[in-house]
Design a protein with these regions (language model features):
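Thiamine diphosphate
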Residues: 1-167
Length: 167
């Protein structure tokens, strides 16, 4: 039986007292977003662009609050410039990134950014953990929250499933 990774990740976020959940709507994060929206101790903030999430997270951290940024790999390109601020200022931020452009991807436009995502994040000083199995996600998230540095947990497309708009 496949673990309920969104429930486990929500539990890890709650245990670490994450209070702000910033996200651009994404089907891969849908269940986790719903759990966070239903949690009275968390404030869910829908973004118009992923870049806004970096600023929100920095402000939250400066104000003493923990946050998480949920996005799809295609949105990583939108945060490249401001992600450098995390390293320069020593601001910890957890990003949970659902991957696109991997094996089985039907949308060829997703492939270049999907392939570039780990390297782009690393070039900006973000530590990258890749979860290829559902049971790896929550431990990677909990570990990132304990170490308080800029970290991206990449969730393989094999875990979240291949999107298909042809059905």
């Amino acid at each position: 039986m496949q673990p309920d990774w969104p429930q486990e990740v929500h539990r890890a976020l709650s245990t670490a007292q994450v209070r702000i959940v910033a996200y651009v709507p994404d089907a891969g994060h849908q269940r986790l977003i719903e759990l966070c929206q239903g949690d009275r101790k968390m404030r869910s903030v829908v973004l118009t662009t992923e870049e806004e999430g970096i600023g929100l997270a920095c402000g939250a951290w400066l104000g003493g609050e923990k946050s998480v940024l949920l996005m799809q790999s295609s949105g990583v390109g939108n945060v490249i410039n401001v992600a450098g601020m995390l390293r320069t200022c020593g601001i910890p931020l957890l990003m949970i990134v659902t991957m696109r452009g991997e094996q089985g991807e039907f949308n060829s436009w997703q492939v270049p950014m999907g392939e570039a995502t780990p390297g782009v994040l690393q070039a900006m000083g973000v530590s990258v953990r890749r979860a290829s199995r559902a049971q790896e996600i929550a431990p990677f998230v909990a570990d990132a929250l304990r170490h308080e540095q800029a970290t991206a947990v990449l969730i393989s497309q094999g875990v979240i499933g291949i999107k298909s708009f042809r059905q």
